[in-house]
């Protein structure tokens, strides 16, 4: 294929390790059912909060809304919470479930290589916790009036699903009370390794996400000097002999969505197998056709997904 940077419409500036992004990314402004909140001013991170169309807060606790902490895709290097495809996807989730969606505008690579996005995810989890405790001077009224802190979920798409996965591992070791994480939701999760899979080889020049582009994304996102067998990329690798592999089994409940038209499908199936082997209760929706990140673009497939997501979220079990 052509130069992957041309495909991405980006220029890497290696001396500063920055990226000039020329990729056209339309953004959606706020409306009455969305708002932007600063998360960490020092890190210049923020949250975009979505609520279902409504005028009055719930009257009783059993009418409160689940809280979904969401991480967008973009190979760790592109897009934001206000990017139109991410905005529309989160708004559809908030409306259909219904739920409050807290979309995290985390730091991008290579300016902020991993684990920066994971650290921002921890900030978001702690922010939700502090909202539940009422510790912040300027408490977010939507969470206070609409949010059920006993029903929180961590969700992501593509590289955002990678962030969600690592955030869920960190959440296990955090005291998040009164927030309780009920499950992990992974849409077309973005993982890799040095070893190629069959689906990698079959669709090297996949028009949506070519192999060379995926490799460049990892080169820009991983810590300098790392390979794709780093634990941030390959979930089958334990980091420095740590207990991260054992921690995976404590997730217990996960919903994985994948499509056979996605060149990453083999990795997603491997992820499901690994989770199940470690004792995680995994629900899957793996369909023929489709492509990487299809739910953010195809409203018809999204409709089917939203019904399945609603079923998963309305399960009353919570994990940690």
Curated annotation (Swiss-Prot):
Assigned keywords, A-Z: Alkaloid metabolism, Hydrolase
- EC top class, in one word? hydrolase
Question: Where does the secretion signal sit in this chain?
Answer: none
Pfam families per record: Abhydrolase_3
Which GO terms of type biological process are on file? alkaloid metabolic process
Catalytic positions are 158, 262, 292
Keyword check for rRNA processing, yes or no.
no
What pathway is this protein a component of?
Answer: Alkaloid biosynthesis
| GO MF terms held by the record | hydrolase activity
* EC nos: 3.1.1.105
**Which reactions is this enzyme annotated as catalysing?**
3-O-acetylpapaveroxine + H2O = narcotine hemiacetal + acetate + H(+)
Query: Organism's domain of life?
Result: Eukaryota
User: Is Hydrolase included in the keywords of this UniProt record?
Assistant: yes
Q: Where is the motif (Involved in the stabilization of the negatively charged intermediate by the formation of the oxyanion hole)?
A: 72-74
- Report the sequence similarity comment from the record: Belongs to the 'GDXG' lipolytic enzyme family.
Q: What does this protein do?
A: Carboxylesterase involved in the biosynthesis of the benzylisoquinoline alkaloid noscapine. Converts 3-O-acetylpapaveroxine to papaveroxine which spontaneously rearranges to narcotine hemiacetal.
Q: What is this protein called?
A: 3-O-acetylpapaveroxine carboxylesterase CXE1
| Gene behind the chain | CXE1
